Structures are given as C-alpha cells and as structure tokens.
C-alpha cells in the first residue's frame, strides 16, 4: 500500500451525556436523568477517519469544520489522534449529536447546529491528497461536502484508478461513477430503492431476497463496482457485477451499542481495499470488524484513544 488513506465528508461532534435515571419527572411521565459525566468524540467523517488512524494507517480528512466550539473540539481531538486535516472553507457550525443515556441505555438524542452554511473553494491540498491516496472513503452525512461539484469531479477522476468507497446518506449525494464499493445500511438501501420506484423490502422483518434485489438495483443505478447492504447482526448482503448476491454472515450475533458500527464497517472495508484485498474479502473483514466493535460495547469499548472524557 502506498499513499495515505483519505476520508472525504461531513464532520460532526458526537457527545454522550451519561447519568442515572431512577425517577420520573413530577409534571410529566418522563425520566429524570442525573448527569454523572460526558464523553465526546469526532463524529461522521471524523469518526471514520479516527477508526482508520487507530487501525495504524496514515489518514487525511478532507472536510468542512465550523468555527463554533464543537468544531474546535472536533479539530483538537482529530489532531490529537493523528488525523491530518485539510479543511474546506466553511462559514457554518459543526453540528452536534448529543445522546442522553441512563447507563448504557439511550433515552434521547438532541441535535444542535443543523443549519448548513456556505462552502468555499476546494483547496489545492485537498485535490492533491485525493489524487495521491491509496484509497478514498467518502463518509456522507448529508451536510453538502459530497455534493460540491469540485469534490465530485476529483472523486470521479480518482475512482478510475484508486479504490473509492462510498458510505451514503439519505439526504446526501449519490456515489460517483466507478466507485468500487457503496455500503448503505438496510433502511438506507430501502429508501434509495424506493426513490427509484421500487418497493422491494418486506420491512420490518428482514427479507434477504428483497435486500439482495435492492443491492443489485443500487449497483446498477449508481454504476458502482459493488454494493454491500449492512444488516446489523445478520451481516451484509454483497452484490457484485455478474455475480449472485451473497450474504456475508456476522461471526457473532451480540446486542450492544451499535452507534458508529456503520462507520466501523466502512473504515474496515477501506482498510482492506487499500491493502489490495478483493471486494468480497474486504467486506468479510468489515463485517467481522463491525461485529467485534458491537460485541465489545461499541464506542465505550475503544478506550481513551477515541473517547475523550470530561467528568461533570
């Protein structure tokens, strides 16, 4: 493998407020959370970049970071982890996803700073990083970076000779022509397929045949090399050109904190493709990595390299 791995996409700040809920509010039937501490980390493309950095790769993140406190915090954490940053000029805020949790159990999610600002010109350093990468992971969180015409032109050109992996979002852009792998989750695949006039999935019950049909449809519509639809504890459904879709089973089936599991899958698949694995081998490794991540309690199991704690 030569060259850095580049992550392109939307940066967020994720925060967990953790406490104890042992009573109800007197004026409404809702729990009262007694705050014990907070944990924060880069989210979105920042989390994917952090995973790759913790996997031992040299990583550059190309994205927009706001000038608010959340942006400053995310920037500092990424730099501490060793992720290189090439920032796209941006006059908006970095959004926050805040989970309120009683122990390990989420009670509520609060989103802040969701308004999208304006982007400036794509820096030359960003173009150079993408063109020189051993692989590019596009981490789309629907904030607009992947819809920038300048970004899409470079990615389409890079995809001709370099693995481009696309982790899509329902409010985001479609993958560029020639991306080697797109990896929507099950609900995203159903939504994307419905947008094409198809209603293939018998939700909420998992229907493997319908998921396979969605994967085939999206691979054809997006004109990408392969589509892997992630299915949580059931693994992933992989559709490649001229091959019957196959289920890549998860090695373990544990229920845990799945927050970040999709980013873990995308990062692990990118790692495999950057190292020259076949798409199928990379997806097998990605399913195993995501499964292990959930089995070891997700973000809480990673340790201080990722989760920066601030007790209150």
Where is each model-derived feature located?
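Conserved phosphate/ATP/ADP-binding segment of small-molecule kinases
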Residues: 143-245
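Conserved post-catalytic alpha-helical subdomain immediately downstream of the catalytic base
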Residues: 221-226, 242-246, 250-311
């Amino acid at each position: 493998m030569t060259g850095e791995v580049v992550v392109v996409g939307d940066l967020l700040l994720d925060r967990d407020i953790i406490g104890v809920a042992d009573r109800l509010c007197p004026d409404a039937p809702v729990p009262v959370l007694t705050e014990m501490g907070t944990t924060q980390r880069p989210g979105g493309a920042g989390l994917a970049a952090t995973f790759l950095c913790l996997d031992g790769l040299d990583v550059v993140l190309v994205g927009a970071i706001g000038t608010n406190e959340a942006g400053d915090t995310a920037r500092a954490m990424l730099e501490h982890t060793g992720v290189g940053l090439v920032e796209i000029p941006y006059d908006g805020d970095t959004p926050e996803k805040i989970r309120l949790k009683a122990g390990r159990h989420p009670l509520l999610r609060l989103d802040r700073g969701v308004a999208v600002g304006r982007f400036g010109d794509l820096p030359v350093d960003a173009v150079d990083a993408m063109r020189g990468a051993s692989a590019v992971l596009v981490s789309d969180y629907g904030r607009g970076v992947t819809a920038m015409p300048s970004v899409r032109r470079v990615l389409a050109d890079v995809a001709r000779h370099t693995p481009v992996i696309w982790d899509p979002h329902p409010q985001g852009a479609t993958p560029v022509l020639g991306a080697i792998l797109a990896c929507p989750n099950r609900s995203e695949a159903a939504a994307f397929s419905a947008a094409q006039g198809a209603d293939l999935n018998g939700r909420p019950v998992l229907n493997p045949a319908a998921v396979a049909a969605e994967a085939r449809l999206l691979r054809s519509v997006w004109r990408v090399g392969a589509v892997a639809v992630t299915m949580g504890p059931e693994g992933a459904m992989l559709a490649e050109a001229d091959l019957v879709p196959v289920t890549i089973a998860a090695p373990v089936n544990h229920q845990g904190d799945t927050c970040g599991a999709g980013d873990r899958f995308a990062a692990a698949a990118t790692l495999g493709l950057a190292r020259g694995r076949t798409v199928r081998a990379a997806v097998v490794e990605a399913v195993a990595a995501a499964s292990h991540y959930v089995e070891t309690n997700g973000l809480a199991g990673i340790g201080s390299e990722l989760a920066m704690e601030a007790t209150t």
